[in-house]
Amino acid sequence: MTEDSRTILLIGSGPIQIGQAAEFDYSGAQACRALQEEGARVVLVNSNPATIMTDPEMADAVYIEPIEPDAIAEVIEQEDPDGVIAGLGGQTGLNVTAALAEQGVLDEHDVDVMGTPLDTIYATEDRDLFRQRMADLGQPVPASTTIALGDDETATDIDEGALRERVDDAVEAVGGLPVIARTTYTLGGSGSGVVHDFEALVDRVRTGLRLSRNAEVLVTESITGWVELEYEVMRDAGDSCIIVCNMENIDPMGIHTGESTVVTPSQIIPDDGHQEMRNAAVAVIRELGIQGGCNIQFAWRDDGTPGGEYRVVEVNPRVSRSSALASKATGYPIARVTAKVALGKRLHEIDNEITGQTTAAFEPAIDYVVTKVPRWPNDKFPEVDFELSTAMKSTGEAMAIGRTFEESLLKALRSSEYDPSVDWATVSDDELAADYLQRPSPDRPYAVFEAFERGFTVGDVNDHTGFREWYLQRFQNVAAASAAASEGDVATPAALGYTNSAVAALASDGGDVAVDDVAATAPERTFKQVDTCAGEFAASTPYYYSARSQGSTGSDVRADRDAHSVVIVGGGPIRIGQGVEFDYCTVHAVRALREAGIDAHVVNNNPETVSTDYDTSDGLFFEPITAEEVADVVEATNADGVMVQFGGQTSVDVGAPLEAELERRGLDCEIMGTDVDAMDLAEDRDRFNRLLDERDISQPDGGSATSVAGALELAAEVGYPVLVRPSYVLGGRAMEIVHDDDELRRYVEEAVRVSPEKPVLVDEFLADAVELDVDAVSDGEDVLVGGVMEHIESAGVHSGDSACVIPPRGLGDDILARVREVTTEIARALDTVGLLNVQLAVQDGEVYVLEANPRSSRTVPFVSKATGVPIAKLAAKVMAGESLADLDASEGVPEQYSVKEVVLPFDRLPGSDPRLGPEMKSTGEVMGTASDPGMAYWKAQVAASNAPVPGSTAVVDLLVEGLGERFEVVTVKDVPAAIRRGEVEFLVSDDRDALTAAVEAEIPYVSTVAAAEAMREGIAAADGAREAMPVADRPVNDETWG
């Protein structure tokens, strides 16, 4: 068989969720390009419509289908692939490939597993097998033993005495408590943790046996407190191996690496220790027979010997979150090389695209420091304990590059956009030590700064945190620089990594200091190139980071300063309310500009995304998204304009201060598209309400209040219940439905702390209304409606958490015509140039406008996949000066139904409330498409792992006609207890305790009447044909909406 004739199946990772985020969109998109470069025909299957990799042009055939064996088997039947690459779709891709092999599907259709063999995957995921292989190799591993279910046992009916006896034996085998319990074949440390007492360990093992695909839990000796390191290794079929980089966690062992601040290259490991672990990493990857990228985790401690002591903790035989970080940190494209190695290419045969002179066989060398910090959703879940452990809770991460660790750390913290919201003045020294230093949490880095400002010593902080002294000395340097600023020394903190505006604010504590004064004396910010070789070869790829520390003079930026160029601001780290959808929009904007002959430069700091790939744009600037730093990029590139519409709230929020900063510097550069003031008008409820009133556009009664009394007065006028929320937020943060004065008073005084600078919005709650989302593009005159979506959930559930269907099912032509009319009026009233999202509600035949956002929305990718209309690309082109008429753009109404369903993180956040409401909680989404709306909904539930088995036992507490006929409905006194005993397999209820039990037991559930009615329709269609069809082949009518 020749290479050109091969058809390769690439399995994606599915929806964004905690433990598996956008890194697999990046790696999958890179792999698609790499395989096609080698002449392979690529078939891609993924369930996530928000990704670049599911664009129809990314592969020869793109299927948006559930990532589960039956759906993949149907695609295999249709496409007849020669091979499948499992290691590029995360844990989801590995698990489904293993299932297809076990079911005989791969053998039946002669599909080879390419790259890393399945036996190797089993050897790394099965902890006993892994321990034995390491022992054979002579590599030290933590003492461990496996607790497994017997042949006739299940996790719900295992004898309690037998379980306790096995746990007791396991504790004795590894040397006593504390221990680490790890669940096999799971994601992001799910079901894992450090356990200090026996009863907690029994509970953890019971949970782990239920979560594990092969019903096993590994109990290991605790190496908490050791240094955690990761080595990214690459190997080809010819046994050539290289180390891409090593990464060091600042947080000690006991905290998941996805939760830790991570630094590369390693700063504290002695060279002898590094060489020992480097040699071990190569020996391990060779012993296991891994081909392609691989991540090996070590624990290390200083035992007084030159090299210290290490343990091999685990191996990920696939591309991972750390692989994405390593790729962006070094410029070495791990996913691209992995894909080519899977085809049989040797490392020396694969070009290094950054240098253009070397190959993938050359190990990267870096002359800078990279720091990654996670981003947690603790603002969305105040009821959840965010103490960090071996199980992930973070949704995303930010990365920064600097010449020193201090500079890199400050840039990373700035990029994370995290506000600890701690009033340190109210925290005593004892509380600081016990609650913020000893207890690992998202606030801990900031607590370390605070401790040093109070005079804590390095030894004090080391005792409380376990952070190594080398790092603490650098934290202390940052704290000292902050103190120096207040005494008039502005050069030191600026050189260390503070922005001019931050230095001015610090210095103003000792007097009035202007940003111009700081800029005049602070070191200039210059741009350096990421080249994979520490300057040994000239780099041809424009991938940059800024530095302003000593020795950072001279800029490496090689932009054509005479060319028409634009800076596009990305979305930063993934968080709830601002997910990979905005990176999709950013990448489409880049592609649109490049198609138009305009240089496109991206400013972003998320290592997981396609927008931060080195060859996506004409210039990649890995920087925090602040007005000052974006303006520096504008100066370096001589850009004509900046686009802030595509990166979500992060990029929109920087628009006004950036406009002021550009004007302050006298730069001839504009914010392109919709005017910044129009964006503000749409977010300012009073101004927006007046705009709608002037045009006789219906809206819920209400307004904004700047005091408790004002809020109570508004609620009295509108009538309870009312919807309350702060202004200028994304994802419904702090939004609630309140029913009386007491609830409103509590909300205003405690939840948002209303003030004249922070008004609260009080609106009539439209109960039982049908909510709609509209995405549109305007060129300032004409308006193209990209799609109209009908929410499946009733009013009161945030649009980002509601399933929705396109085209709408229950709207008459008159309603659609009014929706179009209202959308067009708003677009023109706001002088919209670019994207516009309008959220509406229909009640008793009246169309009400809830809000409008003249920027990208989270539904843009879904609409584009459903209709085939590339609305983000169209928006970028009209922002660059083209008209919709010039572009010959047209609308399209799909013949099939597409349902977007959300994925919720409750299983990863113990203590969270699983009930849906006006505050957004979902992390990602899936899509189901079929000619029958019921089947589309059912496919979406399968993709979201929330599809019940018809005929299974169910508790139905919500009144939904006909749903119970599909199940064996049981009536129990204590529903949560029955669920935990395994007596309930599907739950229909809005009771928090019952829903929490369903989440813990991982059984399907619905919590609203609307979702239950949709599920009834889905189950009725479940036995029908799945209709797997490539995205590009889905039929669309050349019609207009309304």
From Swiss-Prot:
Cofactors (names): Mg(2+); Mn(2+)
Residue span(s) of domain MGS-like: 947-1042
Entry binding sites for Mn(2+) 1: 297, 314
GO molecular function (one): carbamoyl-phosphate synthase (ammonia) activity
Any one biological process term the GO annotation gives: glutamine metabolic process
Residues covered by region (Carboxyphosphate synthetic domain): 1-417
Assembly, per entry: Composed of two chains; the small (or glutamine) chain promotes the hydrolysis of glutamine to ammonia, which is used by the large (or ammonia) chain to synthesize carbamoyl phosphate. Tetramer of heterodimers (alpha,beta)4.
Cellular component terms (Gene Ontology): cytoplasm
Sequence positions that bind Mg(2+) 2: 314, 316
Source species: Halobacterium salinarum (strain ATCC 700922 / JCM 11081 / NRC-1) (Halobacterium halobium)
Protein name: Carbamoyl phosphate synthase large chain
Keywords from the named record: Amino-acid biosynthesis, Arginine biosynthesis, ATP-binding, Ligase, Magnesium, Manganese, Metal-binding, Nucleotide-binding, Pyrimidine biosynthesis, Repeat
Residues reported to bind ATP 1: 127, 182, 188-189, 221, 223, 228, 254-256, 297, 314
PROSITE patterns recorded: ATP_GRASP, CPSASE_1, CPSASE_2, MGS
Domain statement: The large subunit is composed of 2 ATP-grasp domains that are involved in binding the 2 ATP molecules needed for carbamoyl phosphate synthesis. The N-terminal ATP-grasp domain (referred to as the carboxyphosphate synthetic component) catalyzes the ATP-dependent phosphorylation of hydrogencarbonate to carboxyphosphate and the subsequent nucleophilic attack by ammonia to form a carbamate intermediate.
